[in-house]
Amino acid sequence: MPGRSTMEAIFLLRRLMEKYREKKKDLHMVFIDLEKTYDKVPRQVLWWVLEKKKVPTKYVEVIKDMYEGVLTRVRTVDGMTGEFPITIGVHQGSSLSPYLFALVMDELTYNIQDRAPWCMLFADDIVLVDETREGLNSKLGMWRNALESKGLRLSRTKTEYMECNFSKTRGGPNDIILDGQTIPTKDVFKYLGSFIQQDGAIEHDVNHRIKAGWVKWRSASGVLCDPKIPNRLKGKFYKSAVRPAMLYGTECWAVKKQHSHKMGVAEMRMLRWMTGHTRNDRIRNEEIRRKVEVAPIEEKMRENRLRWFGHIQRRPMDAVVKQGDMVQVPGVRRGKGRPKLTWGTVIEKDMAVLGINENLVLDRCEWRKRIHIADPN
């Protein structure tokens, strides 16, 4: 997905699952993992790709000069090894390497890439989606042939399969085969930092975001719990380092009250410890927030969702994220029973709370102004 963010890929996958879950139609996904991604790119393939992409010759020569005659040594417990040449792969740690790798992946798979969200590439994170196992097996076989014929290799143990059995029916064998070997089946997969569950729920991701927030908080507890540091400064540090870790990916959530409450409880525990208070002190949450100048995370989550909604609505009709959001499930009626909560429904509720409608989204400045949640002073 050139020029796209991780959030667009996560959003497309979640929205596709919502639509198929609503119609009770199954989805099958395979998350491809490449062995030693950067170390396996043959140099001749790299030069061939640069030529195919019509990269100017002077730039190709500069890149070749960077890679010619490269030597390295390895530090061991017994000291440094002797120098030895590296004749395969792209340079580790080079800012140019991700771009070169992306060019290689795009060129090698150009003829077999499907449109998003059925096929999404983000660097070396690849997900293939299909309505049937047979179709997914066929796609996986084509990707294996395209990549392994040029020297790359798909991992037989880390490539994973997830079945979204929204129809609740039992089919035949659920194996996805890679080179004669059955790949592992997972109920949950971590994709671009966000946890995707086979039932389309977000409980794992909510728990992971809370844990990520605590990891950041504990790593900075020497500052956040220091009584000599002003509460206002602690609040600024929290808003810069901890809260972003908790909010990553929340704009794509079809969030329920229980999820928002769980996030809010975790945040209040952090803020109380920062100010040196416990619940036994019987100080209201609003007073704690006023001291550190931090708005409720539930409201910041709503701001993030509406900001993301506005971003999507303003995109042109041919944008990947727009077309993916408009995917329809043909020939299937909605199943019986109460419909599951969707991201679109949550957005409608958010707009109702603020008294706004989607006609306002085209005015970006006004939209951002109306949805903004200011931290208390």
Where are these regions (language model features)?
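Short linear motifs embedded in intrinsically disordered, charge-biased segments
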Residues: 57-60, 71-94, 98, 105-377
